[in-house]
Amino acid sequence: VHKLRIVRSFRRRGEIVTMTGDGVNDAPAVKEADVGVAMGVTGTDVTKQAADVILMDDNLATLVNAVEQGRCVYANIRKFVRYLLSCNIGEVLTMFLGLLMGMPVVLLPVQILLVNLVTDGLPAVALGMEPPEKDIMSRPPRRSDEGFFSGGLMGRIVFRGILIGLSTLGSFGTVMRMGGSVEACRTAALITLVVSQLIHVFECRSEKRSLFRLNPFGNMKLVGAAALSAAVLAAAVMVPQLQVVFSTVTPDMMQLLTALGFSVAVPVICGVI
């Protein structure tokens, strides 16, 4: 009875409640909880039937580990969505604003396809494998009425997407003012877009700490995916056969520095803000 009162009291306050139990008298509270946990070794059949989860080893430390993994999975989903939406907003904004400003087509369809394959594939998947952050269990639990984009997540997504789009357009326009051909401008824009997104994937590793405070080698799968994506970009820009396919040209030193400069400017601005 006391367990049942505890469960109902916390649920009235909007909390998500987990209740453990093993005896027949625990079954109502286990059933009432958001997540009912029964003991697999000492638990009665009635309690097991009422439970959502059966703890096979009766070790409550296993329950703590499960909560940690659950928090990690939820956090990684938010990171994954944050990264992909920011990148897509940046790509759409690049094309849309370029047309409004009367520029030539900033990126060709085959180049956009390359961007999606390079930045939306392996890095995004590797980001979803990010290990739990050290302080993940010290954070307060989420409320049951808390939305997925809570904590200003949507604002950060839109803001970062806008910066990616503006930096790509800035790279395109700067190379154009330097007298570069349309192909050179597109190549610079392609480099800026891909590199800025590859930098952003490392920013998405944490919602609490900036890129400059994270261990860059904390997720080696992500490092490998980013390196492979960068290699694909370099091949598309430097290999003559691929230049024909992706309509790129080898940038000169000033064009390359311009493209990389606009790529680096975005995380610096975000880090300062």
Q: What are the functions of these language-model segments?
A:
Residues 1-25, 31-35, 77, 99-102, ...:
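Cytosolic catalytic headpiece
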Residues 189-208, 225-236, 265-270:
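Hydrophobic alpha-helical segments of multi-pass membrane transport proteins
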Residues 105, 119, 236-237, 263-264:
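Hydrophobic alpha-helical transmembrane segments of integral membrane proteins
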Residues 29-31, 48-49:
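Structural signature of FAD isoalloxazine-binding scaffolds in flavoprotein oxidoreductases
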Residues 1-19, 38-209:
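Membrane-embedded transport module
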Residues 167-171, 228-244:
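Hydrophobic alpha-helical transmembrane segments in multi-pass integral membrane proteins
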Residues 146, 182, 215-218, 248-249:
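Helix-boundary and loop/linker segments of multi-pass membrane transporters
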Residues 153, 208-230:
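C-terminal membrane-solvent junction of multi-pass transporters and transport-like membrane proteins
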